Amino acid sequence: VHTEIQLVEQQLNRIILGKPQQIRLALTCLLAEGHLLLEDLPGMGKTTLAHALAESLGLSYRRVQFTSDLLPADLTGFSIFDARSQQFSFQPGPVFSQVLLADEINRASPKTQSALLEAMEEHQVSVDGETRPLPAPFFVIATQNPLFHSGTNALPESQLDRFLIRLSLGFPDRDAELQLLQQDSSASQHKIVPALLSTERLIALQQQIPRQQISDEVLGYVLDLIGHSRKRSDMLPLSPRAAKGLVRAAKAYAFLQQRSFVTADDIQAVFPAVAEHRLQPRQQQQYAGLAQQLLLETPCLV
């Protein structure tokens, strides 16, 4: 059952070197029908990961460079009047793709950010009073630079909450970077990545995720983690949406581990990626590791 998705994972690991856990979490996000936020410095492989993921799965792919003057219609599309037919014809925007890379989303205006996040939530867009469904699967990979970079508009908490998982690829280790330097960069950029999965098969795999078993004891551990965040005065608490997302991600992660049931280890593996961007500190100063703190402070009795 899992052979195809394992082959996809192996292929991605040959393209993105030295990042097996980040690749597994990206696939977890896709299988759980969530959306992915990649936060990293420029040049760390965010675009390469998005493109390789789309090609490996045989999905249509579009990339949009977000800038301060990007308009919502540049994403969703617009209607053009045809003088010959005396009718309006709709020109679909890049949001009508199966994998959309929203590059540097925090450089766009809040209005344009909202247009994308509405499409992510509703899986449809309204243009000129007509609602148009988006293709299935619909997977957004948004990238953003750290907030200390100039020209960035921070995503508000309500919009960050729409992303199931946030990842940072980080710097490669020495061996991976040596391999990277030994590669012919021009050849590797134009290398054809074979599609290993059909769209129909991917949708079928996504439909299997809710059937994964999770015991009441493991759900109790999830509630303990979520509840502990609500007792802390130094951070914004985790919402019920975050709790549901955590369970969904853990089910997909267990599926990738070739198991039909979720363990506490699966919860712990996905919790930082699911929770960290939602655990905003109440003070102005930014600090990381809040999700890890919750894991350490919450007893696991499962």
Protein language model regions, located:
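Walker A/P-loop
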Residues: 27-67
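Conserved alpha-helical scaffold flanking the Walker A/P-loop in AAA+ ATPase domains
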Residues: 25-28, 81-101
